Amino acid sequence: MVDFILNAQVRSDLGKGASRRLRRNAGLVPAVVYGGDKEPQSVTLELREIAKLLENEAAFSHVIALNVGGAKETVLIKALQRHPAKGFVMHADFLRVVADHKLTAHVPLHFINEEVAVGVKQSGGEISHTISEVEVSCLPKDLPEFIEVDMAKVELGQIVHLSDLKAPKGVELVQLAHGNDLAVANIHASRVVKEEGSEEGAAE
C-alpha cells in the first residue's frame, strides 16, 4: 500500500560539480533509483518536498510512489546522505519495489508500556534501549510501519531479545534468521538506587 508520494525529474547533468550546483542554485537534491529489472536512473527532487516527507518517521519504512517525469515508480528509501552540520539531505538512494519479490528494509521499534513495566514500577529500575530499529524481510504488501516492543512484563535485570518480539505475519527478522538473537532492551537498577546503596555500605 502506497501512502507517500514524491515528484522527481530525470537528471542528465551528472557529476559532483553538477550536484553541488543543483543544491546551491535550484534547491534540488540529486538521487538515484535502482533495482528491479531496470537500469539505475539519476533523478532530482525538490529539497523542500523530501524534507517534508521525512518529517514522518513512517516514510522510512513505507513504499513511496515516485513520479519521475510522468512515469511512476514504487520505491523504498535505502540511503540518505545528509549535510554533516546542517542535517539537510544532500543525496538519496531509492530501491525499486517489485510486488512479488521480497525486500529488506529497516523498521523502527516502538516501545510500549514502559511506565508500567514490572522492573520499573515495582523495582524502581530504568529502561535502556539497545537498538531502535530492526531489519526485516517480507513482501512489499506485508511491510510494517513499525514493530512494537511490549515492556509491561519485563523485570529488573531482564533483557529483551529479538526472539521476544512478535513480528507481523509474513515478516521475518533478518538478524534472527541468521542466528543473531540481538538484545533489544533491558531494565537495570537506576543510578540513584546504586548510589544510595554505595553510601549505605560506606556508612556501615
Swiss-Prot record:
Subunit structure: Part of the 50S ribosomal subunit; part of the 5S rRNA/L5/L18/L25 subcomplex. Contacts the 5S rRNA. Binds to the 5S rRNA independently of L5 and L18.
HAMAP family linked: Ribosomal_bL25_CTC
Keywords tagged on the record: Phosphoprotein, Ribonucleoprotein, Ribosomal protein, RNA-binding, rRNA-binding
PANTHER family: RIBOSOMAL PROTEIN L25/GLN-TRNA SYNTHETASE, ANTI-CODON-BINDING DOMAIN-CONTAINING PROTEIN (PTHR33284), RIBOSOMAL PROTEIN L25_GLN-TRNA SYNTHETASE, ANTI-CODON-BINDING DOMAIN-CONTAINING PROTEIN (PTHR33284:SF1)
GO cellular component entries: cytosolic large ribosomal subunit
Function: This is one of the proteins that binds to the 5S RNA in the ribosome where it forms part of the central protuberance.
Gene3D superfamilies the record matches: Ribosomal protein L25, beta domain, Ribosomal Protein L25, Chain P
Signal peptide span: none
Any one GO BP annotation for this protein: translation
A GO molecular function held by the record: 5S rRNA binding
One Pfam family from the record: Ribosomal_TL5_C
Name under which the protein is recorded: Large ribosomal subunit protein bL25
Keyword Ribonucleoprotein: yes
Phosphoserine carried by residues: 123
Family: Belongs to the bacterial ribosomal protein bL25 family. CTC subfamily.
InterPro entries: Rbsml_bL25/Gln-tRNA_synth_N (IPR020056), Ribosomal_bL25/Gln-tRNA_synth (IPR011035), Ribosomal_bL25_b-dom (IPR020057), Ribosomal_bL25_C (IPR037121), Ribosomal_bL25_long (IPR001021), Ribosomal_L25_dom (IPR029751), Ribosomal_uL5_bac-type (IPR020930)
